[in-house]
Amino acid sequence: MEDSNNEASDDFNNLLNKEIESAKEVKLRKFANRNNNRNENSSKVKDASGFRLRVIQTDGHKTKKTDPDYEVTIDGPLRKIEPYFFTYKTFCKERWRDRKLVDVFVSEFRDREPSYYSKTIAEGKVYLNDEPANLDTIIRDGDLITHKVHRHEPPVTSKPIDIVFEDEDILVIDKPSSIPVHPTGRYRFNTITKMLERQLGYSVHPCNRLDKPTSGLMFLAKTPLGADRMGDQMKAREVTKEYVARVKGEFPIGIVEVDKPVRSVNPKVALNAVCEMSDENAKHAKTVFQRVSYDGQTSIVKCKPLTGRTHQIRVHLQYLGFPIANDPIYSNPDIWGPDLGRGGLQNYDDIVLKLDAIGKTNPAESWIHPHSEGEYLLGRQCEECEAEMYTDPGTNDLDLWLHAFRYESLERNSDTQKPLWSYRTKYPEWALEPHRRYMEMAVKEAGKCGPTKTAFSVGAVLVHGTQVLATGYSRELPGNTHAEQCALIKYSQLHPNCPTIVPMGTVLYTTMEPCSFRLSGNEPCCDRILATQGAIGTVFVGVMEPDTFVKNNTSLNKLESHGVNYIQIPGYEEECTIIAFKGHDNSDDKA
């Protein structure tokens, strides 16, 4: 078994290395040709930022076409677009050549029923090279198809798009769940690129893609230079990616690797699955998982994809038997049965049929949110265009517990040896929610500290799964002890034979950032955490330590460099700081 596992790993590494080398060759060729093509491209039609425009994106004066006016309504958790008219233009794609126009519309544009396209084309409302088409029209290479439609866009979340970083070339954002990256299918103005264009007043171009339901870090280019710089790094695998997921059940402690290939089963219902490399359209894939915490029902899991296949993380988690708990595709018991597709299936025909009904006759469901309201057909049509009308999306449509948390360059600064760049978002609320009760417990512990003129008051809680192992607060034990120190001592006194001080998978909650230096010469709390030999794998803090404690506290970098997850839970900063300064002169001003 070990030999076969090693062979599979070697096969994956060989395939990945070939992919990386190919991407690097493309990057070098692009760089070499950039100056050569500068004069050649000067005659190309471009937008204000220098991006080339396709012919169908321009008007007769070779300037960028403007979008039609549209009205946005914020309705509680939903961002809605009022129906509007839009003229859709596209040139014949290679796969459309020598096919009937009506057949192409039916197979490619699935947001309408076949009868709608037949009727629309028969009435002469679709044009081919500016001439009305009919049901017998055949599409040829170079043909321009024009179709004016009355569009009904599905609502998306009304959560704002937060900007993480911006310079003259790139924009880094925290993408909310439920919003497509760019215009596609039924979506145009309820997309990231169009929303940002409306918000910023200029166009941006995606450097990486996130699925519609996935939230988190996205890179968008403001200039062609930014697009090349970031896009080439992504393709050449010069970037590490870290996602956060909330999955069903108690995920194992330790590192879990999955290197099963992935394939598309049915793009119409967005179904993908694990497979063998011998299967048609199989693509090598590998994801590394590590548990962050377990709350008795679900686990927070750190996910590091080494490849970027569609639904890779979701499919690999399902394969392990720990699907994302609110995943409407891969965690729906009515579709997959009690095992939820663990280990993969031999045949997916029944799954495809059931998924095809989602959003039509049945709303989306998931393991954590069964029988919830969601989008489905209302059974009535628009009076203007006869399009089928839908209900508003629900919980399973608007949020997926999968978040792109951190992207980091693999290249290092030659002087500091730190990554050339590193971006992260705030931790998503759905990943923090199970931990708030323990942080509130730590705050109560901090409140037990007596007032002092110079020392600081902190509370700490050690948790394993749902079991509270020990609590502590500053100076609870003799010797100018810190809260984390007290909790660890109290647990070790009750369990003197534990080889790692606390059980593997223990989580520490502390109201203040653990200290990395003790003026008293006592062992810093950061070092005490590392002394557990990985048993404490995650630290949640209420507030980062201010410089008035110890300047340049390096706990965050030190713990993360040793593989410890370090996460702040927002909402407790003021309370934790007020308690910390209890008894100090002018404590209110310091807080």
Curated annotation (Swiss-Prot):
Note on how the cofactor is bound: Binds 1 zinc ion.
E.C. no: 5.4.99.28, 3.5.4.26
Molecular functions per Gene Ontology: diaminohydroxyphosphoribosylaminopyrimidine deaminase activity; metal ion binding; pseudouridine synthase activity; RNA binding; tRNA pseudouridine(32) synthase activity
Catalyzed chemical reaction(s): uridine(32) in tRNA = pseudouridine(32) in tRNA; 2,5-diamino-6-hydroxy-4-(5-phosphoribosylamino)-pyrimidine + H2O + H(+) = 5-amino-6-(5-phospho-D-ribosylamino)uracil + NH4(+)
Residue ranges constituting the S4 RNA-binding domain according to the UniProt record: 99-168
Keyword check for Cytoplasm: yes
Domain of life: Eukaryota
Any one GO BP annotation for this protein: enzyme-directed rRNA pseudouridine synthesis
Chain residue ranges for the region called tRNA pseudouridine synthase: 1-432
Keyword Transferase listed: no
PROSITE patterns referenced in this protein's UniProt entry, alphabetically: CYT_DCMP_DEAMINASES_2, PSI_RLU, S4
SUPFAM superfamilies the UniProt entry points to: Cytidine deaminase-like, Pseudouridine synthase
Domain annotation CMP/dCMP-type deaminase: ranges: 433-552
Stretches the record annotates as DRAP deaminase: 433-591
Cellular component GO terms held in the UniProt record: cytoplasm
Keywords: Cytoplasm, Hydrolase, Isomerase, Metal-binding, Riboflavin biosynthesis, RNA-binding, tRNA processing, Zinc
Subcellular location: Cytoplasm
Requisite cofactors: Zn(2+)
Residues engaged in binding Zn(2+): H482, C515, C525
Active-site residue numbers: D211, E484
Metabolic or biological pathway: Cofactor biosynthesis; riboflavin biosynthesis; 5-amino-6-(D-ribitylamino)uracil from GTP: step 2/4
Other remarks on this protein: Present with 1540 molecules/cell in log phase SD medium.
Family: In the N-terminal section; belongs to the pseudouridine synthase RluA family.
Function field: Responsible for synthesis of pseudouridine from uracil-32 in cytoplasmic transfer RNAs.
Record-given protein name: Bifunctional protein RIB2
Organism: Saccharomyces cerevisiae (strain ATCC 204508 / S288c)
